[in-house]
C-alpha cells in the first residue's frame, strides 16, 4: 500500500482515509489546509491506486497494514484520524485494534458491520456490486441512475467513472462485501477518548444503524450532523469546514 506524506517536519500526525470509488486525491483540497501545521498521512488504498494496480483486500487487513506502516516509521501516536464512508469503516476497525495510540478520531458517514443473517448480507452485497459494476460497464449515464443526483454533480460522477475504468470487479465486490461485513475484535474497549461520528442531515435515516452501532460500541462518541452537504461531501465541497471541525475535535473542544 502506497502512503503519501505531507508536512513531514511537523510532529502532530493526522491520518486521512478516503471512501470507496475515489482515489487518495479525494483530499486534494484538504491537504494544503493541514500540511503547514501537521504531518499529513494519506494512504492510497489497495484497488484504488491508479499508479499501483491491485485489488482491494479487506477493512481488517488495511487497518492492520496502516498500523504496521505507522509503527515502522516510528509513529506510536497520532493526533487525529479521519475516515469517510469506507474510510470510516477502516477507522472503526483501527480504533478497535488499538495498535497505535489515537488522541482523536472522526468517522464521517462510516460504514459499520451489518447485524443481519448471513444470507441477507450476501443479497445486499450482490445488489451493491451490480449497481456499481453496471456503472463501470455503462458509464456515466448508468451512474447517474445509481447515485442520488442531489449528492453528486456531473463532475463528481465523471471522476467516479474514471476510477471505475481501472478498478477491478474483484475490488468492487470486496469493497462492499468487506465494508458491510468486516469483523471486529470481541469485547474491545477503544483507548481513544475523543471520537465523533459525522453524517449529513439528509442521510440521517440511512445512517441509523451505523449510528446505533457506534453508540453501542464506542460510548464516548459524540454525533454531529451537517446541513447542506451529502454523504462524503465535506472534503470536496467544504474543505475549510472539514478542517476547522477536525481541528476542533483534535483540540478536545465540544461540538459547536
What kind of feature is each model-predicted range?
Residues 4-52:
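Conserved HGGG/HGGXW glycine-rich cap/lid loop of the alpha/beta-hydrolase fold
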Residues 41-82:
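Active-site loop/oxyanion-hole signature of alpha/beta-hydrolase fold enzymes
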Residues 83-91:
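Gly/Ala-rich beta-loop-alpha elbow adjacent to hydrolase catalytic centers
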Residues 96-97, 102-132:
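Flexible "cap/lid" loop of the alpha/beta hydrolase fold
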Residues 116-118, 136-189:
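Conserved alpha/beta-hydrolase catalytic His-Asp/Glu region
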Residues 191, 197-199:
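Short beta-strand/loop motif that positions the catalytic acidic residue
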Residues 204-210:
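Conserved alpha/beta-hydrolase "acid-adjacent" motif
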Residues 226-240:
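Catalytic histidine-centered segment of alpha/beta-hydrolase-like enzymes
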Amino acid at each position: 500500500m502506497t502512503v503519501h506524506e505531507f508536512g513531514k517536519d511537523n510532529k502532530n500526525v493526522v491520518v486521512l482515509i478516503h471512501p470507496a470509488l475515489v482515489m487518495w486525491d479525494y483530499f486534494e483540497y484538504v491537504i494544503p489546509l493541514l500540511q503547514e501545521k501537521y504531518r499529513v498521512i494519506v494512504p492510497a488504498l489497495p484497488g484504488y491506486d491508479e499508479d499501483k494496480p491491485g485489488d482491494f483486500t479487506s477493512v481488517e487487513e488495511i487497518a492492520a497494514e496502516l498500523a504496521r506502516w505507522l509503527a515502522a516509521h516510528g509513529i506510536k501516536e497520532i493526533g487525529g484520524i479521519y475516515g469517510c464512508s469506507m474510510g470510516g469503516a477502516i477507522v472503526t476497525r483501527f480504533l478497535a485494534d488499538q495498535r497505535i495510540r489515537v488522541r482523536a478520531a472522526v468517522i464521517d458517514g462510516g460504514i459499520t458491520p451489518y447485524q443481519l443473517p448471513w444470507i441477507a448480507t450476501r443479497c445486499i452485497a450482490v445488489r451493491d456490486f451490480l449497481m456499481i459494476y453496471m456503472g463501470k460497464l455503462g458509464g456515466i449515464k448508468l451512474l447517474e441512475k445509481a447515485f442520488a443526483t442531489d449528492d453528486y454533480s456531473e463532475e463528481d460522477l465523471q471522476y467516479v467513472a474514471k476510477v471505475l475504468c481501472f478498478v477491478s470487479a474483484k475490488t468492487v465486490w470486496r469493497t462492499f462485501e468487506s465494508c458491510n461485513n468486516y469483523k471486529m475484535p470481541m469485547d474491545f474497549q477503544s483507548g481513544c477518548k475523543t471520537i465523533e461520528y459525522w453524517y449529513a442531515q439528509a442521510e440521517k435515516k440511512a445512517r441509523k444503524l451505523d449510528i446505533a452501532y457506534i453508540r453501542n460500541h464506542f460510548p464516548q462518541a459524540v454525533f454531529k450532523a451537517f446541513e447542506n452537504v451529502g454523504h462524503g461531501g465535506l472534503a470536496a465541497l467544504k474543505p475549510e469546514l472539514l478542517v476547522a471541525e477536525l481541528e476542533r475535535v483534535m483540540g478536545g473542544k465540544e461540538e459547536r
